[in-house]
Design a protein with these regions (language model features):
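Extended terminal accessory/targeting regions
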Residues: 1-94
Length: 94
């Protein structure tokens, strides 16, 4: 995990170099790949919608086709997918 100093304190980006994946890791900057773009869209969905479960479901659908054990991006997609799938079992029950 990478720590970046911000005006509000530290933020935690799950993967080095990513701009949008992780608690408090919401930009700035363009996404560096499709996984980072999915994280950005998930963050924006949370900001614009009250139904977080719909945002989480959309995030899972976006990550699933990106999973690939032979690429770093695909492995990151798998890690985020598995984490979110587990979290939604408790928070959204799907």
């Amino acid at each position: 995990m990478v720590q970046h100093k911000t005006n509000r304190g530290f933020r935690f980006c799950i993967f080095p170099g990513y701009n949008w994946c992780g608690p408090g890791c919401s930009g700035p900057g363009a996404p560096i790949n499709r996984v980072d773009a999915a994280c950005r869209d998930h963050d924006l969905c949370y900001q614009m919608h009250h139904n977080r479960c719909e945002c989480d479901q959309a995030f899972l659908h976006r990550l699933r086709p990106l999973i690939n054990p032979y690429t770093q991006e695909g492995r990151h997609a798998r890690l985020l997918y598995n984490y979110m799938k587990l979290q939604t079992l408790f928070t959204c029950r799907f």
